Structure formats: structure tokens, C-alpha cells
A protein has these predicted regions:
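Gly/Pro/Ser/Thr-rich low-complexity, intrinsically disordered segments predominantly at protein N-termini
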Residues: 1-175
């Protein structure tokens, strides 16, 4: 009978003072790998960042790539792109709810796995999480207990001027 692999417990302090490359999520003492490095993922992540960066003054936001977000006392997630209000007090770890967290789904991740990550953001108080699937060219919008799918048109964040054209976004995959 094969023995189960023992997953070492890592304290919050150890996690915060380590420098894993690439960075990993921290969930209740366990380090969770994040898949990065695929071209479609990189293209969408970069386009999302550039799209939001182009509107920081107009939308009164700050935009960060792969910033650590403390979603609970013993949980840290690293969204692909994180949108914060311009008034946010700069800290090295995001500890207040962002306006919006954006994730680009990797082919080896299931939508269920991405949604579990999204639930951490929503429980923290994030208004919405947008998950982008480059393979199906679908955006999944999560708000509270609600999830909608969108393949075209414009995604909007309620109560803000934030808007994102999906055809233009997914179009980078054709270039």
C-alpha cells in the first residue's frame, strides 16, 4: 500500500518571508501552486493589465499584476490582475477588498478550481470576480452567489465606470 504524501505545514510568517518563484497561494498552512507561463494566459493577462492601466485616471483606480491579497487570516491569493480604488492606502500586501479581481483560466485548471479561488475573494468583500477562459473565449462573472457567462459585448462593474470589451480582449489571441 502506497503511503500518502505528507504536505508540510507552513506558517503565515514563513509564507510572507519566503520568496517562491513563481509566487504561490497560501491556504490554511498549505502552499498551492499557480500555473503561469502559457502564451494565451500571458497575452490575456497583459492585455487586461494594459486595458485597465489606460484608464487609471478616468476610472480612479490602481492596477496590479499578481499582488498578494490577504483574503482571510490564514489565506492569501494572488489574482492575475487586481483592481483597487485610487484612494487605496499603499501597502505591500492587499488587505482591504479590491474592487475587482481578474483571473485567466489555465487549461489544466478546472472552472470549479477557479471558482473556489473566486469565492475567497467574494467572501473577503470583493464586489466581483471576472474569470477569463482563453480556450472557450468566455468570461465568467461572479457576484455573490451568482455567476453569469459572457462571450461578447462589454463587461461592466456595477457602480463604477469600469468597462471591458470582450471581442477586443479575446482578439489578442488571434494576433
Amino acid at each position: 500500500m502506497a503511503a500518502s504524501a505528507v504536505v508540510p505545514f507552513v506558517s503565515v510568517e514563513e509564507y510572507l518571508h519566503s520568496d517562491p518563484q513563481p509566487d504561490v497561494d497560501y491556504v490554511d498552512g498549505v502552499l498551492e501552486e499557480r500555473l503561469v507561463g502559457e502564451i494565451d494566459h500571458s497575452a490575456l493577462q497583459g492585455t487586461l493589465y494594459a486595458s485597465f492601466l489606460a484608464h487609471v485616471k478616468e476610472w480612479q483606480i490602481r492596477v496590479y499584476i499578481e499582488a498578494r491579497v490577504q483574503v482571510a487570516q490564514t489565506r492569501f491569493r494572488i489574482p492575475d490582475v487586481c483592481i483597487l480604488p485610487a484612494s487605496w492606502q499603499l501597502t505591500q500586501i492587499v488587505r482591504q477588498p479590491p474592487l475587482l479581481c481578474l483571473e485567466v483560466k489555465s487549461p489544466s485548471y478546472t472552472l470549479k478550481r477557479e471558482m473556489a479561488r473566486a469565492q475567497d475573494y467574494l467572501r473577503m468583500g470583493v464586489a466581483a470576480v471576472w474569470i477569463f477562459d482563453p480556450e472557450t473565449r468566455t468570461a465568467y462573472v461572479l457576484r455573490g452567489d451568482e455567476m453569469t457567462e459572457q462571450r461578447e459585448g462589454v463587461l461592466r462593474l456595477a457602480g463604477t465606470a469600469i468597462a471591458l470589451d470582450l471581442v477586443a480582449l479575446f482578439g489578442v489571441l488571434d494576433e
